[in-house]
């Protein structure tokens, strides 16, 4: 797991990808590369809920400078908000025009029923058509799962009907099973100013950090460590490990910082999310 600190998010991202030698992981320059941000709702990234467009710009520039051209940004906002509005408000419409890449609204996509390790789930066809998937989640809290990062961000690649179904089944098991088919090839985590309490933002905690990883299970295990949770408190992580998605053995993680952090950030041991979670009554919510 690599990390970098600073304020120039685009250049930080490019340096992080150079350090990770991302281009050596992509099999062919003709590969269709999908970039999956978190645009849960139409709110600017500074609010603490959505992926900073500067990070996506850094990924696109890094790839285009190495002659990768077949790229697409794909996402589906949560039920109740329109992805098209999120693309506009979050700066992705202008980003796509600037770099000449396609935007795919997975809320409007066709789907295929897939066998996800014994669980049938509807998955968007645009995601299934990818050769290489770069996941760009926001490190933040969640009122039901405590944390949301790499594994849960794949939920934006299923239709709204399936999102509701996830909640009817209980989030943890379907999130884990989804990741047996939607395999993340590389992860760039927006740890700039995520809301550590709620998935829709409003209380951003400025950390000015970006992470990179290849294993979504190990990535989310590290996120639990950062936010003072035990891995067992986020059941989908261990379920995903048992399904062969990745490793939750944090003792095997190799952490490397690309630069020094100028200011330390205190993460409270007890936060609002812990108090709220027990009071949440889930009725087909879809975040």
Question: What is the predicted function of each stretch?
Answer:
Residues 1-287:
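N-terminal and secondary-structure boundary signal
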